Amino acid sequence: MYCGRYETIGETRGNSLNVFIGAAAGFVAAVALINSGLATSFYSTPVRAVPQVIVPSSLAASSQLPVVPKETNIQVNSAQILYPDSTVKGQERTITILGVCSFLSASLFYIWKQFGMKARTTKPADLQEVSGGRIWSLASTTGSNIGAGKTVRVATRKSPLAMWQAEFIQSELERLWPGITVELQPMSTRGDKILDSPLAKVGGKGLFVKELETALLENRSDIAVHSTKDVPMELPEGLVLGVICKRHDPCDAIVFPKGSNLKSLEDLPHGARVGTSSLRRQCQLLLKRPDLKFLELRGNVNTRLAKLDSGDYDAIILAAAGLKRLGFSDRVLPGETNIIDPNVMCPAAGQGALSIELRTNDPEIAALLEPLHHIPDAVTVACERAMNRRLNGGCQVPISGFAQLKDGQLRMEARVGSVTGKGPLIIQSKTFRLPWSGRTWPQLQKESEALGVEVADMLLADGAQAYLDEAYASRTLGWA
């Protein structure tokens, strides 16, 4: 898997299946065409009659044979008059009909599946359709519109990125359930208001979701839309992170001021000022570039970019998904040279994925959201969050985790670093086969979480606890 080119398993086999279905449909149609007699009528040909004639039994019995005048051109069917090589020509035509119909049907069906269906669900900023993993989806729609007349209240932060995400979910629900009403409820969270202190000192990432969760618990909202990496590992009783949407780019990007000639991390000059408040990003970059100077960076994406362009920093680190969703395509350089490889900077748990939080006792809302749950990405996110939860990871600790699912293999890699940047990264990974056939989402979730916990225990066995203790004893530093 490569950041910026995020792949979903099953797409290749799905394309092949589309072609096969189309070809089969064309073959069946061609057989029906031939059997109906239309094919032979289409290929009836003026021929010169020859004396060799099929004689009906009734005429043969009476010896009243029909006479065909010499040199007479008549319109005949190959099933009526037997002329030389008529059988061969009929076979050739039959094969031609079968081949042409199968090819055309397969081509048209493939084009419709690949482009016609996707054209109806294209979303802004290149975000792939949420329900793109149709073969894995939990959706069990039967044609009934359970959304008709239903109102869904969506709690969201007020930042441009948060609003984009909420509007995206709104459009998906309206597409899935005609007649549904989706109301957005923008809210200011404490995390949005406190911009002069590191979050580790004032409560961590939970400050971005607490007000939204309160609205859910008080039944003022039905769902809350989040950037999954900002959601705490432990949720309040009565709430569940029930939906993980199709994941976008999970990687980080190094962004340069407008007009800069820099193209990648390697191009940064010695001692460059890099804006990021993330301990996760800092400790990994320090191992590659110990000369860099990190400066505090807070605010929404637009604010951070404005600070960069004003000269406060030589570069800043942002999530690639946020840039792409907001349409800052000019900040992603040609060839995506400024997208940082996950081998250099392992992403945060859940980075790049939208998630939806809801009440555990609300089956009607859960049914409406079910088609948005993208199981392959839900599996990887569940694995990452389980690892982080096992380590009691919060914003004070430089923990990163990235799971990848490909060809039935689930691979999890996690890293823990020192908040001082002086010690080496502790890195552990493991891969195991995750069978899909006949498995339910709860079964897949349980096994993926078990892998996350196992990798976390491997980190602890390798000495990660010392780094964790160091981080929690040094909360005056930044946040991860």
Swiss-Prot record:
EC number: 2.5.1.61
Transmembrane portions of the chain: none
Any GO MF annotation of the entry: hydroxymethylbilane synthase activity
Pathway membership, UniProt: Porphyrin-containing compound metabolism; protoporphyrin-IX biosynthesis; coproporphyrinogen-III from 5-aminolevulinate: step 2/4; Porphyrin-containing compound metabolism; chlorophyll biosynthesis
A Pfam family: Porphobil_deam
GO CC term (a single one): chloroplast
Substrates-to-products reaction catalysed: 4 porphobilinogen + H2O = hydroxymethylbilane + 4 NH4(+)
Cited PROSITE patterns: PORPHOBILINOGEN_DEAM
Record's cofactor remark: Binds 1 dipyrromethane group covalently.
UniProt entry tagged with the keyword Transferase: yes
Major place of residence: plastid
Keyword vocabulary terms for this entry: Chlorophyll biosynthesis, Chloroplast, Plastid, Porphyrin biosynthesis, Transferase, Transit peptide
NCBIfam families referenced in this protein's UniProt entry, alphabetically: hemC
Name of the protein this chain belongs to: Porphobilinogen deaminase, chloroplastic
